[in-house]
Amino acid sequence: MTKGAPLGHLFLYAVPLLLGNWLQLAYNAVDSIIAGRFIGQDALAAEGVAGPVMNLVILAISGLCIGAGVLMSEAFGAKRTARLKETLATTLLFGAALCCAAAALGCALTPWLLRALAVPDSIFGITGIYLRITFLGAPFTFFYNALAAGLKSVGDSKTPLKFLAFSAVLNAVLDLILIGGLGFGIVCSAVTTVVAEAASALLAAVYMAHRVPELCPGHGQWRIRRDLLGPILRYGAVTALQQAVQPICKVLIQGQVNALGVGAIAAFNAVTRVDDFAFTPEQSIATAITTYIAQNRGAGQTARIRRGFAVGLRLELGYWLLMGSLTLLLRRGILSLFVAGEGAADVIALGSTYLGYMAVFYALPALTNGFQGFYRGMGKMTTTLIGTCLQAGLRAAAAAVLAPRVGLPGIAFACAFGWCVMLAFEVPYYFWTCRRWEL
């Protein structure tokens, strides 16, 4: 990325990430669509309550794997094969123990979590069952992410995408057969998700064992090395904390939505699936910006940094125009995929109003993600954490004020408020950074 036009580099790097994001989002949306249409509004609401809690666990796992991936990439680049294998072994052993403990703790604390979130009595039982089963799937999620990080560290970003695609298709097929065809309930929805996660982890392990021997630890390398664990945790801690802030905020907002009733909960679950299709690809473009800036900074090509960042922002805004327009035009049709039968019209009306506002507001996270990508590429991880905490904290506070007064649209305005504050912090700091680095 240190030579040639920035647009080509950024676009080609972001496309596989975007495809992976869309597959993961489709994977999640299929669960919600099938639950809402074949089981009912209560099942859709139950998944909506459980989602933010599980996202907190998943993003913490992702942060740990990102930290390990950085170290594995360094070892691979330095041709230190033994260190590469030992880093992967340390990550897998420590992460497995951590995830098993988190799964057990999550299962034990599920009733307390649901009471803290003020989950309505009508869905308390099924939400608890769904959440406990998905907690048990956390170790499989970790294994897939850790193995995928290993494959990406040696330059293979396509194979993890294939396993993710297989997992998404398997989940959809199992849901359609067992829930849509045979009439099983919410328990089956949770189980099929865990089975699909386990399948992706197993495929990655088998592939690595047979096709990527340079990643496979030997018999004497299966141990936790403290000298490697420290850097893994340090690299991953800031990323994990930053990623965890958003789902914590979402859990707090979910508590405000829960007070609005089952219909609002179901609508919010549906619209957040649409939101994800806006936010997550914008984060992928930000990752491309990060890589571009980091490579050029490392190569001393500071003259390319600001130009590449401007191109990245244009890509972000271009994606917003596409996603915002589609959301505005198709929002009612999209929402009708999630619900059917009694109460569906109310859920669609609530969600449609929310998405009408958000289609415009999606421009704000396009900008904030671009700036976050810039700061990560410049090595300013603390700046990204401060910006995220400002945005999430004020968004949650605004939601607590607005949601009881104006309902679900209040959540949309709270999001916009948080993003505006984040930009008010990041934009001036960007110009200060450019002056300091003479960009």
Residue ranges and their predicted role:
Residues L12-D31, I133, Y144, S167, ...:
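Transmembrane helical elements of multi-pass membrane transporters/channels
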Residues L44-A104, T141-P160, A267-R331, P365-G379, ...:
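Small-residue-rich hydrophobic transmembrane alpha-helices
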